[in-house]
Regions:
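Glycine-rich anion/phosphate-binding loop at the beta-strand->alpha-helix junction
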Residues: 256, 310-348
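A helix-coil-helix interface module used to build multimeric assemblies
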Residues: 63-276, 283, 287-295
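Active-site-adjacent "gating/activation" loops or surface patches in catalytic cores
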Residues: 289-310, 314
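Basic polycationic patches enriched in arginine
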Residues: 8-9, 26, 61-63
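Ala/Thr-enriched low-complexity intrinsically disordered regions
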Residues: 2-5, 15-17, 28, 47
């Protein structure tokens, strides 16, 4: 009986506790209900505002086609007039074109080797293949970008594009799987980029620097006998001649330009880890290192880096850029000197 009484008391306490808990939960809910309402309302307003912002952004993006005012970088914007000649070498269009060129020339070189499966290709098609990159258009580049949106791989998109071009030629179906044979993406990138730099230097940069040097030499000759008060530490010093001061920069530029031209422009080309593993396993009878050296030198005009990992060592590119930096430093010095000559009214 005592046990039964204790049980009834426990049930009574438990029921009271449950009732009290329910009341507390109810009170808490009604206390936070207005806050929850305000929070949900704020969330809706924020969501609506975000949608308006996104709609506005989308509207602006549609309107803001690339031009000198909408370009993100002043290189392609404000200074487009000064840099547009470099677009043929350093734009994404140019990079894609150079990749196509390297892939085509590599395939042709495999045919010239020849690989056993490529013996049936008539050399008369080589010029047709080269016309793929010689006549490369923005539409071709856009086709590669469309393929890339599916593959999510830029170099693989170039390979698929070339397979489509082979299909258009007819009679090439048995050979198109040898496009990009044994290569890794960096074999294409680390040849395309150095090739673009080489051609930009040869066709744009060197002619401009040489034109500057020639103009300075002309001035140095014209002003050879013009006396000028030299200064050191901003104070009058011994006399000099204006022509000689100009020749200082001719001398500096010529030597730095020679050092730049002495830098080898090198490329990495050797498979996934730089060892031609896939090439050797597939065709051990060929000297693939000699093949790579010949291909890079004769078809691209570059020098192959002998020992690499999957990527280029980049040391020689660094040397090129450092040499260009020194040339820039010389030109900055020249500009500052002439600015000072003007401020001292040596020039008017």
């Amino acid at each position: 009986s005592a046990l039964q009484a204790e049980g009834r008391r426990f049930e009574s306490v438990n029921a009271h506790t449950k009732q009290k808990s329910c009341e507390e939960i109810r009170e808490t809910f009604f206390y936070f209900l207005p806050l929850l309402y305000k929070l949900s309302l704020s969330f809706c307003l924020i969501t609506q505002e975000k949608e308006l912002i996104l709609q506005s952004d989308n509207y602006l993006r549609k309107r803001m086609e690339l031009d000198v005012l909408t370009a993100i970088s002043p290189i392609d914007g404000r200074y487009r007039g000064k840099t547009k000649a470099l677009a043929a070498y350093f734009s994404e269009f140019a990079l894609i074109k150079y990749r196509v060129q390297v892939e085509v020339e590599y395939f042709i070189t495999l045919c010239e080797l020849p690989l056993p499966q490529l013996k049936g290709i008539d050399s008369s098609v080589f010029e047709t293949l080269r016309n793929i990159y010689r006549n490369f258009s923005e539409a071709d580049a856009q086709r590669i970008k469309d393929i890339e949106s599916v593959t999510n791989h830029d170099v693989k998109a170039v390979e698929y594009f070339l397979k489509e071009e082979f299909d258009k030629m007819g009679g090439m179906d048995d050979y198109k799987e040898f496009i990009h044979f044994g290569l890794t993406s960096q074999d294409i990138n680390n040849t395309s980029v150095p090739l673009s730099i080489k051609e930009a230097l040869d066709k744009v940069y060197y002619p401009l620097i040489e034109e500057l040097i020639a103009q300075l030499k002309t001035y140095a000759t014209e002003w050879a006998e013009i006396p000028m008060l030299a200064k050191t530490h901003g104070q009058p010093a011994s006399p000099t001649r204006l022509g000689k001061e100009v020749m200082v920069f001719v001398y500096r530029l010529e030597r730095q330009l020679a050092m730049l031209k002495a830098c080898p422009i090198t490329a990495k080309f050797g498979g996934a880890t730089g060892n031609y593993n896939a090439h050797h396993v597939a065709y051990p009878e060929f000297d693939w290192k000699a093949f790579g050296n010949k291909f890079v030198a004769e078809k691209l005009g570059l020098e192959r880096e002998e020992y690499t990992t999957q990527i280029s060592n980049y040391d020689n590119l660094s040397a090129i850029f450092d040499a260009m930096k020194r040339i820039n430093t010389v030109m900055i010095d020249m500009n500052r000197d002439f600015w000072q000559y003007i401020s001292m009214e040596y020039f008017k």
